[in-house]
A protein has these predicted regions:
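Long, low-complexity segments enriched in small/aliphatic residues
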Residues: 425-469
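Short, ordered beta-strand-loop transition motifs
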Residues: 314-316, 352-354, 457-466, 500-503
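Conserved phosphate-handling catalytic cores of large alpha/beta enzymes
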Residues: 109, 118, 123-129, 139-211
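Beta-strand elements of well-folded, non-transmembrane domains
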Residues: 422-426, 474, 497-499
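Hydrophobic helix-and-loop "lid/oligomerization" segment in the mid-to-C-terminal part
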Residues: 2-115, 135-137, 185-404, 415, ...
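Beta-strand/loop nucleic-acid-binding surfaces
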Residues: 471-487
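OB-fold/S1-family single-stranded nucleic acid-binding modules
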Residues: 501-516
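Flexible glycine-rich surface loops and low-complexity tracts that mediate binding to linear polymers
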Residues: 489-504
Length: 516
């Protein structure tokens, strides 16, 4: 890992720290944060309205992650509002895999549905759409994923491929919400309270699917966070989940939701039935249901920790490839992400399930997983994803071991971590500047800070952590280094600023004693 001081090249604002943070995120025009290209005016919105008005028995096919769950809930509440007979289907991760398939379509046929609407999936379901049509169903695809080149032969809504849409980096749930909003706008029957319930779900999904917090994304996430902090949240399911957060400081931020609420939602789709959370978001706000959802997440944590403790890495590998037996495939992405965070190397974690070897890969920005892996001459059973995350499966071990060997031939550039040299009045002043940029998340991140300082007032906590103080700019500031025992001396310190129940402190990311 290389560490370099970040220097701003453009002056966007007068405040030095604010200017550096904006430059760090490649934001050179404040309109990117303040401007909103919304509402959407889809090219084929009239066809959507006609199709919705035409059919009374409608099936929704959603995905099992947070985005798909929220998108399913949005479309379900919309169709119920119109008095439709609506039925939603979310596939099982292990049995069905991602997206639309013949098994899910058969459920819609058995339910006597005449129209299928996909949410957060379907843009690459060419054969599946044909299968549905051959059985007498019409199909509307709503998705935000990129097409492999060919589109399904049906009505499709995807902001990436609609010339009327100026900002397309939105999640699947927001695509669903924008269609619902467009329907009511064209009918001149907008119910603000009802739509607020839906946009809150789309905002939560925007955080979960790590969408850039620009344009309309920034607007809806900011409003969601504001509603939560002012106790004005409309969706009771979201309110109940927020109430279960182990949050000891105020206000709640988008990052808090990302780390505390989103994993709870995703856990049901990873280990059990994502429909639990759809039920929570669409009217079943029982204590028993949320207890079950929380319980599934606790199980997910325990299984993840157990599996992670058994992983043994070959440190000679350029790219880590692990094959674990008897692991729930819903944990693969979490495990590869945990290894990546610790090692900063691209990582794949695989397991054997249903006669297939399935895996999940994660990488930093320095190595494009999708581009590099798709260039390999390997017989994949399935492959898909994007720059930093991919899913792969093999039908036999020979192909897997060929992949494990040949993936080592890639050159992985050394990742670079940029920092801002700390030269500011106080942690309080810095925190106020950071707070002024909320919501913070994808597309608007805070770099690490750096100082070279003597440490003092050292306290060892639980025999493995070190609390200490640093004298900077005529005042002492409190720091903590987790899983590290320190002694007095001069140190190079990389840190991030955290708001804790005990006040602001620097959380150490990297620390090294300066040689005398």
């Amino acid at each position: 890992m290389n560490y370099l001081e970040f220097e701003a090249k453009n002056k966007i604002v007068n405040d030095d720290l604010l200017n550096k943070i904006l430059n760090y995120n490649n934001i050179y025009d404040l309109d990117l944060l303040n401007k909103t290209n919304y509402p959407y005016d889809y090219e084929n919105i009239d066809e959507f309205i006609k199709m919705i008005d035409k059919h009374n028995n409608i099936a929704i096919i959603g995905d099992y992650d947070c985005d798909g769950i929220c998108a399913t809930a949005i479309m379900y509440l919309f169709l119920k509002r119109l008095g439709k007979e609506v039925y939603y289907i979310i596939g099982n991760r292990t049995i069905d895999g991602y997206g639309m398939n013949s098994n899910l379509i058969n459920h819609a046929i058995e339910n006597k549905s005449k129209l299928i609407i996909t949410v957060d999936n379907g843009i690459n379901a060419i054969d599946e759409v044909e299968y549905a049509k051959s059985n007498g169903l019409e199909v509307i695809v709503t998705d935000h994923h990129l097409s492999s080149g060919e589109f399904p032969n049906c009505l499709c809504f995807n902001p990436h491929y609609d010339k009327n849409i100026k900002f397309s980096d939105v999640c699947g749930a927001f695509v669903a919400f924008s269609l619902v909003h467009s329907y009511f706008r064209h009918k001149n029957s907008v119910d603000k309270s009802f739509l607020t319930n839906l946009y809150e779900l789309s905002a939560l999904a925007t955080i979960a699917d790590v969408m850039p917090l620009y344009d309309i994304n920034r607007n809806i996430v900011a409003n969601l966070v504001k509603s939560i902090n002012y106790n004005k949240i409309t969706n009771k399911g979201i309110k109940m989940l927020v109430g279960r957060m182990n949050k000891t400081t105020n206000p709640i931020t988008a990052m808090d939701l990302s780390f505390s609420v989103v994993p709870i939602i995703n856990a049901s789709g990873r280990l059990d039935d994502a429909s639990f959370v759809v039920n929570l978001f669409t009217g079943n706000e029982s204590k028993e249901l949320i207890d079950e959802i929380i319980s599934i997440n606790e199980k997910r944590k325990n299984l993840t920790n157990e599996a992670f403790s058994n992983i043994r890495l070959d440190l000679s590998e350029n790219i880590y490839v692990c094959l674990l037996e008897n692991i729930n495939e819903g944990l693969l992405g979490i495990l590869s992400g945990k290894i990546l965070n610790q090692t900063k190397k691209p990582t794949f974690v695989f397991t054997t399930t249903n006669d297939l070897i399935k895996g999940s890969g994660r990488s930093l920005e320095n190595f494009d997983l999708h581009q590099n892996i798709s260039s390999m001459d390997i017989n994949f059973n399935s492959f898909g994803g994007h720059k930093r995350a991919v899913g792969i499966s093999f039908s036999n071990k020979e192909d897997f071991f060929k992949f494990k060997k040949e993936v080592q031939m890639f050159t992985v550039p050394e990742p670079v971590t940029y920092y801002i040299k700390y030269n500011y009045k106080s942690f309080n002043d810095v925190f106020k500047t950071i707070r002024s940029l909320e919501p913070i998340g994808e597309g608007l991140k805070i770099p690490y800070f750096y100082t070279c300082s003597e440490i003092s007032d050292i306290k060892i906590i639980n025999e493995k952590h070190t609390s200490f103080r640093v004298f900077m700019n005529n005042r002492f500031e409190r720091f903590i280094a987790y899983n590290t025992i320190l002694e007095s001396g001069l140190y190079n310190i990389l840190f991030e600023l955290k708001n804790t129940p005990y006040g602001l402190q620097g959380n150490v990311y990297k620390i090294a004693k300066v040689s005398e």
